[in-house]
Regions:
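Alpha-helical transmembrane segments at the extracellular/periplasmic loop-to-helix junctions
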Residues: 258-277, 294-369
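Helix-to-loop transition at the C-terminal end of transmembrane segments
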Residues: 18-36, 246-248, 305-318
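Start-transfer (signal-anchor) and selected internal transmembrane alpha helices
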Residues: 1-26, 36, 277-298, 366-369
Length: 369
């Protein structure tokens, strides 16, 4: 990252969370994490350290006496360990995991802020990119993800989503010169998919934007889409092999990286390859591109629907209907986008406030207003 803006963004992020620690009196200073999930996550990591059982995700104290296997994956566990292990010379494992987990979320906001400053500079200038960083820091919904004391994987999901979009925005501004950026974006998207299936939305936005760009006439977007899909495919397959033991490579779980997601990225790579081949024809007009795009969509949707029809029910589609109704009504982060549960449309609009302003600004920039 060149320029001073990313470094300033990192400083602003650390200053922001430092002020929260000094003036906000967060519970972590009293030895409390944000919610029960944070404690369960640290228990899971502690069990990994003490047993070394990488593929054993059973939590024996949950749903006793049977125990419970969470839908969580190991990548975030490794990130927390990376922040915790340097503390071991100064405290025991229990305390090191507590403070490593408590600081993981705010520390992961640092690279996210740096990426925003780096990618935004080309579009809104240095000052504008730093203003975007400030807006990123002070939004209540985003702060809730990155707050001190929240040892939760959503902070890593959001940082990886920012990485995907920042890499593709930078590629778009450089007019396709930096061909490695879509490949890196695909790898970041695969890392997000390893962390949680919420990353499917990031993949849809990123891949869909590249496909739409090619459809509307940006010819280098076809190759970029292929590189993105290739990075996504290779990294996702590697993640699947690492996350699951060989006996579970054919397991199908909608809410955790499994065979269904492996098949999905293979189909997406096939569709992207079809677009890339068509993109070599510089004379292909809009009707031809539209036909190819439709064929690519069918190449993904038809086999996926035949092999895994439950995929389209969402990550919680296989949960017992009685449990699903209670779960979706009570856990806001698990709610479907359109079928609101506990959250009202007013609350959803409030959460999207920053996006609405960004859309208005983008339209104004596009039409020179």
């Amino acid at each position: 990252m060149r320029g001073r803006e990313p470094l300033i963004a990192a400083g602003l992020t650390l200053l922001f969370h430092g002020c929260v620690l000094v003036f906000g009196s967060p519970g972590v200073l009293a030895g409390r994490l944000v919610d029960p999930d944070c404690y369960v996550r640290l228990m899971r990591i502690e069990r990994l350290v003490t047993t070394g059982a990488w593929w054993d995700g059973l939590m024996p104290l949950l749903n006793a006496p049977q125990g419970l296997v969470m839908h969580w994956t190991r990548l975030f566990d490794l990130v927390v360990l990376a922040f915790s292990l340097p503390l071991l010379p100064f405290m025991d494992l229990h305390q090191a995991l507590f403070w490593g987990g408590a600081l993981t979320s705010p520390l992961l906001q640092v690279p996210a802020a740096m990426l925003i400053a780096w990618a935004g500079r080309a579009y809104v200038g240095g000052r504008g990119s730093l203003l975007a960083v400030v807006l990123f820091l002070v939004q209540p919904g985003i702060y809730g993800v990155y707050q001190v004391g929240r040892a939760d994987h959503h902070c890593l999901l959001l940082t990886l989503a920012v990485a995907v979009l920042a890499l593709l925005l930078t590629w778009a501004h450089r007019c396709g010169v930096a061909r490695h950026l879509p490949l890196l974006a695909g790898i970041a998207a695969a890392a997000g998919l390893w962390v949680g299936t919420e990353a499917l939305m990031t993949i849809a936005v990123a891949g869909g934007s590249l496909a739409l760009g090619w459809l509307l006439g940006r010819r280098d977007a076809a190759a970029a889409l292929w590189h993105f899909a290739l990075g996504l495919l290779l990294a996702s397959v590697l993640a699947l092999l690492l996350e699951r033991p060989p006996a579970e490579w054919t397991a199908v779980e909608l809410d955790r990286l499994s065979l269904v997601h492996g098949v999905l990225v293979i189909l997406l790579a096939g569709a992207a390859g079809l677009v890339a081949l068509a993109g070599r024809n510089t004379r292909a007009g809009f009707p031809v591109r539209l036909t190819v795009a439709a064929a690519g969509a069918l190449l993904v949707l038809v086999p996926l629907g035949l092999l895994f029809p439950q995929f389209f029910a969402g990550p919680y589609g296989e949960i017992d209907p009685a449990n699903q109704a209670v779960f979706l009504q009570s856990v806001r982060e698990a709610e479907p986008m359109l079928a609101r549960g506990a959250t009202t449309w007013a609350e959803a609009s409030f959460a999207l406030g920053g996006l609405l302003f960004a859309l208005a600004f983008s339209l104004a920039q596009l039409y020179g207003l």
